[in-house]
Curated annotation (Swiss-Prot):
Gene: bluB
UniProt-recorded name of the protein: 5,6-dimethylbenzimidazole synthase
Family that this chain belongs to: Belongs to the BluB family.
Its job: Involved in the biosynthesis of cobalamin (vitamin B12). Catalyzes the oxidative fragmentation and contraction of the isoalloxazine heterocycle and the cleavage of the ribityl tail of FMN(2) to form 5,6-dimethylbenzimidazole (DMB) and D-erythrose 4-phosphate (E4P). NAD(P)H is only required initially to reduce FMN and oxygen drives the oxidative fragmentation.
Result of knocking out the encoding gene: Cells lacking this gene are unable to grow in minimal media and fails to establish a symbiosis with alfalfa, and these defects can be rescued by the addition of vitamin B12 (cyanocobalamin) or the lower ligand of cobalamin, 5,6-dimethylbenzimidazole (DMB).
Length: 227
């Protein structure tokens, strides 16, 4: 056992088989929910647990650059939905033919249907001008915030809460709606609500948009392209 002169360490080891299975189940059955939300509101205690899980995420230099803007009012969500709809129409025009038709068939109603939305942001000034671990890779604060999103998503799966990540919008429009400062970046708009059914595989795979790549095609040994 490693020495611990400051008394800061605690015993560590593998989880029990049931605990491991629960962790992997959450990972493997997590889905991006687009339209299957139930109207039942989430309790404040549940929301606090999910945000607590997000706040436990690792961050570069312990920067903790995230903030969470909770959005529940219909008026605000409708403004965001209109911003999404404008961007979604623009996105549809970037595809053509059968691909465009399939894109337009994909429903994304979470902004309106989910009882809670969370705008997850990254304050790139937090921690000062020089942040440990970010000196040569300044984008690490954004990656850290994405870790918080993943933590929340997995915790939500364990709680029976669906999460949908909306990324089709002009950031400037959402910032204006929510009064987000210029130096803060939006990382994710998350729609949250209870679900009683989930797709057995990712929805985009189930609907023929794209399939999961074989893992063995993505793993290299000691260098790019080396297998």
């Amino acid at each position: 056992m490693l020495p611990d002169p400051n008394g800061c360490l605690t015993a560590a080891g593998a989880f029990s088989s049931d605990e491991r299975a629960a962790v992997y189940r959450a990972i493997e059955t997590r889905r991006d929910v687009r339209d299957e939300f139930l109207p039942e509101p989430l309790s404040e205690e549940l929301i606090a647990r999910l945000l607590g899980a997000a706040h436990q995420a690792p961050s570069v230099g312990f920067m903790q650059p995230w903030n969470f803007v909770l959005v529940r009012q219909d008026e605000t969500r409708e403004k965001v939905w209109q911003a999404f709809q404008r961007a979604n129409d623009e996105a549809a025009e970037m595809f053509s033919g059968e691909r465009q038709a399939k894109y337009r068939s994909l429903k994304l109603e979470g902004i309106r249907k989910a009882p809670l939305s969370i705008c997850v942001t990254c304050d790139r000034t937090r921690g000062g001008a020089v942040v440990l671990g970010r000196t040569h890779n300044p984008q690490m604060d954004l990656y850290s915030t994405v870790c918080a999103v993943q933590n929340l998503w997995l915790a939500a799966r364990a709680e029976g809460v669906g999460v949908g990540w909306v990324s089709i919008f002009h950031e400037s429009e959402i910032k204006a709606i929510l009064g987000i400062p210029d130096h803060v970046e939006i990382v994710a708009w998350l729609c949250l609500g209870f679900v009683d059914r989930l797709y057995q595989e990712p929805e985009l795979a189930a609907k023929g948009w794209r399939q999961r790549l074989p893992l063995e095609d993505l793993v290299f040994e000691e260098g790019w392209g080396v297998r």
